[in-house]
Amino acid sequence: MFRIREAVKDDLDDILSLIKELAQYENMGDQVNCTKDIFYESLFIKKYANALVCEADNKIIGYAIYFYSFSTFLGKGGIYLEDLYVKKDFRNKGIGKEFLKFLAKKCIDNSLGRLEWECLDWNEPSLAFYKKIGAKTL
């Protein structure tokens, strides 16, 4: 069983570790310069972004980083999903879908106009996941 919740300060080490895993997967491991202090300030002091985590057996197995955006065409705010990552051993169990449902509910509850993200064009597993859940390519 797993649960998704808003991240807290004590989650930062685990999230940073997962960010590094994602960066390695995307062949960008050398580009992660974020430290725990920078991350803490950005998330909890300046509130540039928000983080969600997924826990299973009291261990963080995935995370999502998002921030609020704005569409001039819609005249409404939205959510931009910066990162969505689930540890390899926990994939294909519905966790990614639950992260997106959590964010979609935030959009609905706050009358936001969209939930959007980008995916690398070579990331076939992620592209297949997004297609399976009915996401539209813009």
Could you tell me what each predicted segment is?
Residues 41-53:
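A short helix-loop-beta-strand connector motif used in the catalytic cores of GNAT acetyltransferases and
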Residues 97, 121-138:
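Conserved active-site alpha-helix within GNAT-family acetyltransferase domains
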Residues 90, 94-102:
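Conserved acetyl-CoA pyrophosphate-binding loop and the N-cap/start of the following alpha-helix
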Residues 108-118:
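Conserved GNAT acetyl-CoA-binding A-motif
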Residues 53, 59-67:
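Conserved beta-strand in the GNAT
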Residues 3-15:
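A short beta-loop-alpha structural element at the N-terminal edge
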Residues 16-42:
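Conserved GNAT-fold acetyl-CoA-binding loop/helix
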Residues 77-88:
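Conserved acetyl-CoA binding element of GNAT-fold acetyltransferases
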